[in-house]
């Protein structure tokens, strides 16, 4: 538990821009180095994105926007003791920053000018009459609501935290308060504390970005429960992967007959996290820590799917059917033997990083839609899929990346017996590292198939049968300035470092 004596001096890490001095350049001028490739943002309703083949975009480090949000959050914390205690517990018990859990804040209308100057824009979304909603289209920032009488200067009148399950949050904090919205509502919320003119709320979303609680119909509730069960019971292992893909696509259509694609997307990824978590100890430990505060994986950043060349186009078609829009695409075939398509479903708030083996001569094609032929050799991603199955099918996600206080999480997990590999991104605006990988048993039939195709040596085959191979990770990530992008060279380095043929677990950073 946090020391109560430290609460008054807690200048929350939320005020990162000033407390740590990370950012000093104006958001309008600050762009990440050209080596960091980015893409166009999504919106709701999603705008037309520039095709990835048209060129790469640099995501900005929006330090002024972060500073502005942080100032408002700090002002709220100074007046709301429950929120202040929770911020300290998040830091000390989960290794996370209060900032990363904020869904939205409600401020005075006169604050609009400052937020607009920092890069926020008006969003057309369902909200109370007379309320302006602002979002940042180029950065990961909480949204801002400006209703009449919405705050006092820099002090928000309301701050809402994003939970994975609202009932879990209330139970974790022993709160006997009503929940607005039954299960199945796009937005559910509860009042957590009301102190000194500030109200702390907790919210739960189901494929929605709006700010009005609308009770679902009984039919929709039944449909949502049925859809969740269809995803949870999806069969993953078939005689051939083609059969598995066909089954997944059929299951998708069955779900879409029950609910809209935004709800279907939200429910699908909740089950994918559940499946991945069951196969990764670091994930279970951290989930338990976050569940103690009733938050679940509300801090997820992106979901990483490794895919075979044969079914990469199928995975991307599946995602687009769920409402994903393609963002940046990485072509690292000549550099490191891999490529990746990043996609975003803005309404559900889900980002997918899907990677695949890529040959040097394939860097000029749109490999997200063009079917890739069998390759004469396996890269890191292809071998992982050969040993364990595709993430879309048997293996589940390679990793979930969530947003943390990087150093605190590393140290706190170490105390739980979980080591962290050396960072593969170590910038002021982006730090990333894997927990040491979970070693999985490899089926003999998979090894035999790879041997028969000449893709493994006898020595490698023997090693995988005897020792297994690294399967999945939890990724520790810390972002600043709302930076949304990734570092291609850093990803190349970690892909090479986790190749099952020559993996040597890095020393803890």
Where are these regions (language model features)?
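Extended, well-ordered protein cores
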Residues: 7-509
């Amino acid at each position: 538990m946090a020391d109560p004596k430290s609460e008054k001096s807690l200048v929350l890490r939320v005020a990162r821009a000033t407390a740590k001095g990370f950012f000093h350049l104006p958001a309008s001028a600050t762009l990440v180095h050209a080596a960091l490739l980015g893409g166009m943002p999504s919106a709701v309703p999603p705008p037309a994105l520039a095709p990835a083949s048209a060129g790469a975009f640099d995501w900005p480090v929006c330090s002024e926007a972060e500073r502005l949000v942080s100032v408002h959050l700090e002002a709220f914390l100074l007046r709301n003791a429950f929120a202040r205690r929770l911020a300290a517990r998040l830091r000390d018990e989960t290794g996370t920053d209060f900032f990363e859990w904020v869904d939205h804040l409600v401020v005075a209308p006169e604050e609009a000018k400052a937020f607009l100057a920092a890069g926020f824009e008006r969003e057309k979304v369902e909200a109370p009459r007379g309320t302006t909603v602002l979002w940042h289209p180029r950065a990961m920032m909480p949204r801002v609501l400006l209703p009449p009488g919405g705050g006092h200067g820099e002090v928000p009148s309301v701050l809402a935290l994003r939970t994975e399950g609202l009932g879990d949050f209330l139970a974790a904090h022993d709160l006997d308060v009503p929940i607005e919205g039954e299960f199945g509502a796009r937005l559910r919320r509860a009042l957590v504390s009301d102190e000194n003119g500030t109200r702390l709320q907790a919210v739960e979303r189901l494929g929605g970005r709006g700010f009005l609680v609308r009770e679902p119909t009984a039919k929709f509730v039944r449909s949502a429960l049925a859809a969740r069960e269809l995803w949870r019971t999806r069969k993953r292992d078939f005689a051939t992967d083609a059969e598995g893909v066909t089954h997944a696509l059929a299951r998708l259509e069955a779900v879409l007959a029950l609910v809209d694609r935004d709800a279907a997307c939200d429910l699908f990824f909740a089950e994918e996290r559940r499946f991945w978590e069951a196969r990764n100890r670091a994930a279970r430990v951290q989930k338990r820590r976050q569940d103690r505060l009733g938050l679940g994986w509300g801090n997820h950043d992106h979901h990483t799917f490794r895919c075979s060349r044969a079914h990469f186009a199928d995975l991307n078609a599946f995602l687009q059917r769920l409402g994903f829009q393609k963002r940046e695409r990485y072509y690292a075939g000549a550099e490191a033997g891999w490529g990746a398509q990043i996609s975003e479903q803005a309404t559900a708030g889900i980002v997918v990083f899907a990677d695949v083996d890529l040959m040097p001569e394939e860097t000029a094609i749109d490999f997200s839609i063009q079917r890739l032929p069998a390759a004469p050799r396996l890269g890191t991603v292809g071998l992982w899929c050969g040993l364990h199955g595709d993430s879309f099918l048997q293996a589940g996600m390679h990793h979930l990346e969530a947003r943390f206080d990087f150093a605190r999480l590393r140290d706190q997990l170490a105390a739980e017996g979980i080591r962290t590999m050396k960072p593969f991104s170590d910038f002021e605006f982006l730090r990333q590292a894997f927990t040491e990988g979970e070693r999985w048993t490899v089926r003999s039939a998979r090894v035999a198939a790879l041997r028969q195709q000449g893709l493994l040596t006898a020595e490698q085959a023997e090693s995988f049968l005897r020792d297994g191979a690294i399967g999945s990770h939890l990724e520790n990530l810390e972002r600043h300035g709302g930076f949304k992008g990734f570092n291609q060279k850093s990803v190349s380095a970690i892909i090479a470092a986790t190749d099952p043929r020559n993996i040597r677990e890095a020393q803890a950073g």
